[in-house]
């Protein structure tokens, strides 16, 4: 009960007391000075350091993003260039194939023409040789026939029989 009486005598906690206000203010200022002297600087430094770290992280992220975009653009350009190069290689290969095909076809036609010409020349030579041989045989047979006619001094009927037999010999000799 005694404690209740002290509270009642002093007027309560919510009543303004000038001594209490003074000492509370002095204590607050001392604590504020101590905080400012010893903790405020390191706290501000830590906050500034954190702010710089966050800003650096944002700057690095922005740089990385720009670098990634540059690499992406470069890769797109390289891909487009590779596609163009592939198209060029395909086109050149096709042109080379067409050119090679034309050359081979031309060579084949020339070779065929040469072979045909050679065969015709060979046929003509064989034909001339056969004709020469035939003329020689006909001349020989004619000479033989003339010799027989002259030697036999035969009549017209016998001469005709001799010529016919020589023609038959020639026909048989040809076959």
From Swiss-Prot:
NCBIfam families: ATP_synt_b, PRK14472.1. It comes from Chlorobium phaeobacteroides (strain BS1). The gene is atpF. Its main location: membrane. Belongs to the ATPase B chain family. Gene3D superfamilies: F1F0 ATP synthase subunit B, membrane domain. One of its GO terms (cellular component) is plasma membrane. It is found in: Cell inner membrane. The chain crosses the membrane at residues 19-35. This is ATP synthase subunit b. F(1)F(0) ATP synthase produces ATP from ADP in the presence of a proton or sodium gradient. F-type ATPases consist of two structural domains, F(1) containing the extramembraneous catalytic core and F(0) containing the membrane proton channel, linked together by a central stalk and a peripheral stalk. During catalysis, ATP synthesis in the catalytic domain of F(1) is coupled via a rotary mechanism of the central stalk subunits to proton translocation. Component of the F(0) channel, it forms part of the peripheral stalk, linking F(1) to F(0). It is a single-pass membrane protein. Disulfide bonds: none annotated.
């Amino acid at each position: 009960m005694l404690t209740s009486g002290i509270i009642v005598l002093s007027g309560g906690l919510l009543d303004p007391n000038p001594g209490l206000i003074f000492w509370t203010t002095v204590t607050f200022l001392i604590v504020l000075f101590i905080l400012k002297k010893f903790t405020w600087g390191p706290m501000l430094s830590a906050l500034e350091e954190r702010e710089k770290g966050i800003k650096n992280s944002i700057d690095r992220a922005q740089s990385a993003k720009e670098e990634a975009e540059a690499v992406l653009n470069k890769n797109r350009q390289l891909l487009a260039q590779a596609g163009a190069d592939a198209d060029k290689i395909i086109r050149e290969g096709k042109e080379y194939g067409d050119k090679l095909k034309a050359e081979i076809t031309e060579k084949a036609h020339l070779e065929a023409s040469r072979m045909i010409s050679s065969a015709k020349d060979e046929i003509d030579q064989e034909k001339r040789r056969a004709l020469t041989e035939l003329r020689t045989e006909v001349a020989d047979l004619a000479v033989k026939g003339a010799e027989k006619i002259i030697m036999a001094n035969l009549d017209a009927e016998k001469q005709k029989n001799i010529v016919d037999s020589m023609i038959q010999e020639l026909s048989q000799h040809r076959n």
